[in-house]
Regions:
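Short helix-adjacent coil turns
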Residues: 14, 20-22
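Short, cysteine-centered beta-strand-loop-beta hairpins and adjacent loop/turn segments enriched
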Residues: 103-113
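Hydrophobic/aromatic beta-strand elements that line small-molecule binding cavities or substrate pockets
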Residues: 80-86, 100-102, 117-124, 137
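Short beta-strand edge/turn micro-motifs at domain boundaries
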Residues: 95, 111-145
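A solvent-exposed, acidic/Ser-Thr-rich amphipathic alpha-helical stretch
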Residues: 4-5, 23-90, 113
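Generic short beta-strand segments
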Residues: 33, 98-105
Length: 145
């Protein structure tokens, strides 16, 4: 598969995992060395504000975390638009710029959690395909960015 098509597929697979509440499918996206640092809000450009949501990838721990999230929240809408895909000259690294507009609602109706903005998803080519190395959150950039 062409690398650009492969990156598009993994972005779409991640979205499909959210929409179907499929923790196992979501786990297929992650690189074994991913660590998930995350901004607490969409304008936290300064990493001094960020939190560490998940330590180094551990399949069982991450699966339990995702399954709990999927059990507690339902997706109201999920629109993701790929704006740019860049493949390294060596063909073994890539990133995708994705505009995200996702709204989650607690299944008990008590709260909503919007995830809106632009993400840069960073990938490495592994023997079993492309895997996400990092995504530093979904940020809202100034107009015209």
């Amino acid at each position: 598969m062409d690398p650009t098509d492969a990156i598009r597929e993994i972005v779409e697979r991640e979205s499909r995992a959210y929409e179907t509440y499929d923790a196992d499918l979501m786990l297929t996206v992650f690189h074994p060395d991913i660590v998930w640092a995350w901004p607490p809000h969409s304008r936290a450009y300064d990493p001094m504000e960020w939190v560490l949501r998940m330590g180094r990838f551990n399949r069982e721990r991450w699966r339990a975390y995702l399954q709990k999230f999927f059990d507690d929240y339902e997706i109201v809408h999920n629109t993701r638009t790929i704006r740019k895909i860049v493949i390294s000259a060596e063909g073994d690294g890539a990133f995708a710029v994705v505009d995200i507009d996702t709204l989650w609602r607690r299944r008990d109706g008590s709260a909503e959690m919007p995830n809106t903005g632009r993400a840069c998803k960073i990938y490495a080519l592994m023997p079993d395909g492309w895997k996400m190395m990092h995504q530093p959150g979904t940020m809202t950039y100034p107009a015209g960015a």
